[in-house]
Amino acid sequence: MMVDRRACGTAQKNQGRSKHQTEPPLKGCIYFICARGAHTNIFDYSLFSIHYNNTGGFLMPQLWQGRSSKAVDSRVNDFNSSIRFDARMIEQDIHGSMVHSAMLGKQGIISQQDVDDIHKGLQSILNDLHSGVLEIDPNAEDVHTFVEQTLTARVGDAGKRLHTGRSRNDQVALDIRLNLREASLHLQGQIKELILTICDQAEKSSSYVMPGYTHLQRAQPVTFGHQLMAYAWMLLRDLGRMQDATARMDAECPLGSGALAGTTYPLDRFYTAQELGFAAPCGNSIDGVSDRDFCIELTSAMATCMMHLSRLSEEIILWCSWEFKFIELDDAFTTGSSIMPQKKNPDVTELIRGKTGRVYGDLNTLLVMMKGIPLAYDKDMQEDKEAVFDAVDTLELCLKTITPMLATMMPLPANMRRAADKGFINATDCADYLTKKGMPFRDAYKCTGTMVGACIRADKTLEELTLDEFKQYSDLFEADIYDAIDLTHCCEGRTSYGGPTQASVLKQIADVKSKINC
């Protein structure tokens, strides 16, 4: 590939060991690219005019310059451009264009020869992008402009007919749906992988007794497996939310809505909807181009998932601290300190906790962007992609990192048990013991509270009281009190559905796996 060096800057200073020198073009420039493959000249510039701007580079003409008689200020071009963030939709843009052109041919709106030329040209663009022969021009206004003008340079007038019966308004509404559909399916797969990793750890630790907490105070005995499975259920709901959002996204196809009022061409919108994997075309053309509910809904699901990852991360941060020491993280997923040699920092989980606010910001951006704009399409809506794509990328990165970290995490059951032995987490079981012997629960609660207070003053646990000392508080106490307040018995005695017994944890694992079709 050859690049016109009039459009190039200097090599990056940070490319120390890199064998390849990158020379980025100046802003506003277009690559002059020649193929190494079947096409001698990818861009035939005789097919359209090329404008030279005052930054030292060339600009393609905008697709929308119909009534304009004056060149747009280069600063407006830079401000208006979306190529840096919508370029990721190029495969979806090409796919949508192939289906749209096929429909135009089917309806007799363009000739079959034009359809064949368009498809051949679009496929060649896709092939050259994949092989690296072609790069996306960073100075094109947007991905739609780049594709159409590259196509026209390759196939001539047939490329100019591609946009018949279509607006960029319905085109971008389609592209982002197709892109987010793929992104959602990928994220769903990652969430499933994380859930299975949690299930594996929970199965191994289904009998490890630890304190359960409320208000970050030791409360009642649970097992580590039970605690982990709480997050599996949260993530299962996240999976469901993404599936629901994707199903609604796939319900309606916006292609054919035009700018807002449909078109006079005899389009077959049901054909394009079916070919693109949608249930039906959208029922209202204005809604078709102005709807971004699907971005908001998917980002909301991602924000909720990030909230759950953040809660899990916070627990991991606590658990691996010396104050808890319930787990040990693998060295590969921790960092050190530049000054304190003893440090082993859980940076992964801290970053996840921090990045959660970033995704919340993405959701807020979408909501605020959409709340006040009139129908139909407004340029404000260009801001949707940066927000939703950032949320996708952030969640994808967090899931990709936390899953292997959890897979290599090592529980420390002895430390969990030592923590459980302190804090009177069996006090509720003591009160339940008296209640089952006939004492009203509120009286049993008060009696046990008095005992706990006395034990704290005497620096004892409930298990360390003699039977005579128990009887000083109630004659209902018998020798079986010691079994009743044994921590393992406390866990195994909580046989209510969804509880912490080992059998319950194993059933939860089986239920969760069945729900994700494993």
Summary of predicted features, one role per range:
Residues 280-364, 368:
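Acidic, glycine-rich loop-and-beta core segments that form the ion-binding/anion-interacting portion
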Residues 12-20:
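Short, charge-rich patches within N-terminal targeting peptides
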Residues 59-96, 157-158, 340-518:
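Glycine-rich cofactor/substrate-binding loops
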Residues 1-2:
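Methionine residue identity
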Residues 58-248, 252-253, 258, 262, ...:
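A helix-coil-helix interface module used to build multimeric assemblies
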Residues 97, 118, 122-125, 187, ...:
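Amphipathic alpha-helices that form helix-helix packing interfaces
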Residues 40-59:
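Short, Lys/Arg-enriched N-terminal segments with co-localized hydrophobic residues
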